[in-house]
Amino acid sequence: MQKIRKGDKVVMLAGKDKGRTGEVVQVMPKEDRAVVRGVNVVKRHQRQTQTQEAGIINKEAPVHLSNIAIVDKDGKPTRVGFKVVDGKKVRVAKRSGEVIDG
């Protein structure tokens, strides 16, 4: 079970976008990376294809999972733990102890 999943609201802990929040769009567990909406936006030079024009586009680049943390109810970053509730393994916010919906 992953600590950070698609749809989670996260905050950047390091890098040029430190402190900014966004929603996880994609998680790549094999590379330990995630794509976060509106964070780590880079410019890509797009080659022309039959469907797309050439030009410079803005795109979210993946960030390492160690540089992001889930946002707790009070808006501050929290670590994630696991607990068994009613026979199911669920994610729990270490800061508040609340179950993270997922």
From Swiss-Prot:
NCBIfam families: rplX_bact (TIGR01079). The gene is rplX. The keyword rRNA-binding applies. One of two assembly initiator proteins, it binds directly to the 5'-end of the 23S rRNA, where it nucleates assembly of the 50S subunit. Pfam families: KOW, ribosomal_L24. It comes from the Bacteria. Part of the 50S ribosomal subunit. This is Large ribosomal subunit protein uL24. InterPro entries: KOW, Rib_uL2_dom2, Ribosomal_uL24, Ribosomal_uL24_KOW, Translation_prot_SH3-like_sf. Belongs to the universal ribosomal protein uL24 family. Gene3D superfamilies: 2.30.30.30. The keyword Ribosomal protein applies. Keywords: Ribonucleoprotein, Ribosomal protein, RNA-binding, rRNA-binding. GO terms for molecular function: rRNA binding; structural constituent of ribosome. GO terms for biological process: translation. GO terms for cellular component: ribonucleoprotein complex; ribosome.
